[in-house]
């Protein structure tokens, strides 16, 4: 099967094009740094496989995710490259395009965001550009799918009759050095003359990954030639001279291809950015937007829908299942397991799906509109005081959905210590798995202020992440503050299709977890409540679950929720935070009183909020722990990532409850 790779700058629509060409769905967002590892999909019409590589501005990698690109181009086998560029930022995007052309591999150029360029008054004669580069160019709008069908039909012809032809003349002295380097590379390695020229150029540009691919003897010979030409070039470094020549080539190339509007008019983006990223009013605007989202999720739309679903699952659905089981003569043990264990456990989590969907919809709306990238800029000023940059906030925002991709997104951070710090604080971001716990408790104890209470927990998670990062960056992970440079994407009206796909995929993941982790956890919790030292079908107070819960309940007694029931729900929370709610449904609903009534009797508003603080901050779930181990390659850092949140949660909850108890 033929392999094709898709490459481009960050946030030019690579993943949108990948989704359009393969029919799959990978997470997309209107900001840079969304793709941090290569993704593989099967092209429609069995054309071949398409590999979506992380966005990069240059083939000299400076961050972990960018090494994936250079490593793939050097070591993997592929039939051709699809280089997608932003038509509204063509000159800057051509920097990477030129480097890819120097590979002298079959290549198509996808001219994306033609609609944005047109709105800005930018005119591009892509036919003329195609003739100059002798490379096929396809105008597309990846977000809507316009032009992608034609591109798909042409991909199978990529490479047919291809003849390597691209070459930039870097001047007599540098070209002589490149020639000598090529001779060494072809003699000492298996690379042909075109690959050798590319390697020589990248070596002169100080691409360290290229150097790592060569043996030490070849590196020493090439380094000697580089030092010689550096003396000949004079005061200007070889790299800077080559970049100057390359920039001149691009300017000449685009001179009669791109026409810009006569006036340098102030676009809508610039005007709105002055307000949304303002150092004084930007943050209040962000908090107000988040409040509106939570108000819609918990008061206006989400909760009423959840109440209807709860009534259906707890009433009509459960009664129907009982009737069917009685008709079929199912033994009492299985009846109890299915109704009191599986339906009660899994159903108690599924009732929050409407709230999850509403929240995900609005988060996707903010992402696709381009607003989230502005928040990263806004937060950069604040995060600098805590030893981080705005680049760390992008993975943190992703953590609002799930902490696992949040940790993986830290690959885009160049500074290794800042990357590690971001990984360690990412679990403090309140993921969607914690939302059912919040929804349950705010619906019982804080009916009039549900959105404010939930917002306060999200803000608390961010504050704790900042405070911990301060400690880490001043002690074991000292680093110099990195300069945060981010490309602000154009504001755009979100695509209904994109919003639907994004919301659907996230909600589907939540439901899928209900069918795996939560299902398994519910069965185990019910069995532990059903079995005890004295046999089966025991009173829950004589069960193994009561024994486990009593031990942990004793430990959290000073935190305000020291009952055995609360203690028992904390343990399976390590599996998945949603299991806390399913465990409560099984434990608290085992008696005659309903779940809500029992919780009201065992918690107060103060202890309920303390419980939510603890759930927010204590140990990450098992999937997050696995992601931390994978990204840090260290059991030491993984152990720290498990231990310190638990200590932090205990101390902060203890302080909150004990101080609050003095006034309430």
Curated annotation (Swiss-Prot):
Coiled-coil ranges (or none): none
Residues spanning the membrane: 281-301, 342-362, 382-402, 425-445, 452-472, 516-536, 544-564, 567-587, 608-628, 637-657
Record bears the keyword Ion transport: yes
Cellular localisation: Cell membrane
Protein name from the UniProt record: Fe(2+) transporter FeoB
Origin species: Staphylococcus aureus (strain COL)
Residue sites binding GTP 2 per the record: 33-37
Annotated residues for binding of GTP: 112-115, 141-143
Keywords, alphabetical: Cell membrane, GTP-binding, Ion transport, Iron, Iron transport, Membrane, Nucleotide-binding, Transmembrane, Transmembrane helix, Transport
Any single GO CC term annotated in Swiss-Prot or TrEMBL for this entry: plasma membrane
Record bears the keyword Iron: yes
UniProt topology in membrane: Multi-pass membrane protein
The gene coding this protein: feoB
Residues the entry annotates as binding GTP 1: 8-15
């Amino acid at each position: 099967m033929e392999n094709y790779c898709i490459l481009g700058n960050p946030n030019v629509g690579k993943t949108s094009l990948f989704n359009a060409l393969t029919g799959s769905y990978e997470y997309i967002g209107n900001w840079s740094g969304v793709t941090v590892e290569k993704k593989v999909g099967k092209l429609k019409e069995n054309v071949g496989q398409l590999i979506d590589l992380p966005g990069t501005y240059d083939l000299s990698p400076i961050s972990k995710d960018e090494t994936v690109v250079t490593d793939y181009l050097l070591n993997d086998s592929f039939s051709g490259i699809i280089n997608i560029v932003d038509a509204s930022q063509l000159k800057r995007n051509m920097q990477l395009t030129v480097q890819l052309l120097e590979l002298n591999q079959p290549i198509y150029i996808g001219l994306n965001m033609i609609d944005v360029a047109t709105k800005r008054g930018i005119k591009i004669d892509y036919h003329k550009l195609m003739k100059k580069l002798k490379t096929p160019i396809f105008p597309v709008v990846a977000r809507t799918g316009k032009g992608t069908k034609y591109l798909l039909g042409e991909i199978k012809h990529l490479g047919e009759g291809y003849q390597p032809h691209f070459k930039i003349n870097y001047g007599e002295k540098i070209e002589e050095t490149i020639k000598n380097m090529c001779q060494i590379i072809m003699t000492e390695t298996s690379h042909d003359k075109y690959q050798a020229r590319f390697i020589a150029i990248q070596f002169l540009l100080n691409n360290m990954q290229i150097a790592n691919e060569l043996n030490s003897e070849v590196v020493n010979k090439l380094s000697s030639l580089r030092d010689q030409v550096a003396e000949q070039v004079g005061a200007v470094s070889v790299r800077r001279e080559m970049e100057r020549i390359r920039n001149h080539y691009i300017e000449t190339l685009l001179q009669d291809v791109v026409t810009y509007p006569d006036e340098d008019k102030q676009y809508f983006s610039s005007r709105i950015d002055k307000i949304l990223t303002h150092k004084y009013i930007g943050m209040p605007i962000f908090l107000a937007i988040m409040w509106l989202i939570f108000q819609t999720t918990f008061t206006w739309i989400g909760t009423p829908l959840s109440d209807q679903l709860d009534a259906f699952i707890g009433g009509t659905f459960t009664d129907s299942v009982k009737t069917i089981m009685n008709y079929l003569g199912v033994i009492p043990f299985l009846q109890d397991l299915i109704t009191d264990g599986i339906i009660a456990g899994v159903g108690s989590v599924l009732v929050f799906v409407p709230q999850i969907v509403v929240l995900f919809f609005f988060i996707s709306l903010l992402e696709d509109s381009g607003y989230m990238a502005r928040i990263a800029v806004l937060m950069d000023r604040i995060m600098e005081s805590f030893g981080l940059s705005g680049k760390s906030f992008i993975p943190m925002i992703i953590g609002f959905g799930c902490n696992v991709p949040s940790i993986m997104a830290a690959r885009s951070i160049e500074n290794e210590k800042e990357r590690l710090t971001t990984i360690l604080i990412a679990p403090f971001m309140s993921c969607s798995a914690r939302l059912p716990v919040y929804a349950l408790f705010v619906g019982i104890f804080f009916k009039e202020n549900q959105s404010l209470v939930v917002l306060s927990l999200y803000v608390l998670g961010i504050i704790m992440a900042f405070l911990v990062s301060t400690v880490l960056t001043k002690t074991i992970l000292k680093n110099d503050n990195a300069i945060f440079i981010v490309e602000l994407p154009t504001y755009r009206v979100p695509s209904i299709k994109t919003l639907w796909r994004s919301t659907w995929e996230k909600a589907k993941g939540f439901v899928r977890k209900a069918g795996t982790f939560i299902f398994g956890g519910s069965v185990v919790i019910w069995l532990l409540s059903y079995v005890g030292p004295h046999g089966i079908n025991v009173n829950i107070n004589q069960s193994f679950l009561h024994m486990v819960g009593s031990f942990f309940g004793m430990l959290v007694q000073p935190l305000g929720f020291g009952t055995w029931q609360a203690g028992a729900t904390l343990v399976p929370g390590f599996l998945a935070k949603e299991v806390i709610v399913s465990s409560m449904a099984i434990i608290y609903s085992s008696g005659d009183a309903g779940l809500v009534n029992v919780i009201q009797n065992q918690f107060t508003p103060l202890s309920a909020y303390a419980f939510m603080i603890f759930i927010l901050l204590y140990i990450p779930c098992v999937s997050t722990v696995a992601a931390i181990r994978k990204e840090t390659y260290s059991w030491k850092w993984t152990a720290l990532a498990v231990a310190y949140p638990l200590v932090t949660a205990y101390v902060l909850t203890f302080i909150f409850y004990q101080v609050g108890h003095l006034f309430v």
